[in-house]
A protein has these predicted regions:
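DUTPase catalytic domain/fold
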Residues: 1-100
Length: 100
């Protein structure tokens, strides 16, 4: 079973060519862990941003009972700067739940 949380960019930013940056998101996420269930979260960058040359640098899953605002680390691997406006959707956090 899974649940999808859409994440949006908090502040406008321009990512220069070759730069690695941390992008702050607006939403706070809580990955609940119920008794008898194992939960974790995984962030996926929007495909349209990946096609522009934005690469997701960190793929570590978010552990159970994690609460906070995710910090997304990306690299601009394109030949031109990439602009992200405030409230643009950056990607989705998928929260997976498995029974023991």
């Amino acid at each position: 079973m899974y649940k999808i949380e859409k994440l949006t960019v908090k502040n406008r930013c321009e990512i220069p060519v070759g730069s690695v940056v941390e992008i702050e998101v607006s939403e706070e996420v809580h990955i609940h862990s119920d008794l008898g269930k194992q939960c974790y979260g995984q962030f996926y960058l929007r495909k349209c941003l990946a096609k522009k040359g934005l690469l997701q640098c960190v793929h570590s899953p978010f552990p159970a009972n994690w609460k906070g605002k995710p910090l997304i680390v990306v690299k601009n691997d394109d030949v031109a700067p990439i602009e992200l406006r405030a409230d643009d959707e950056i990607g989705c956090l998928w929260i997976f739940t498995h029974k023991y």
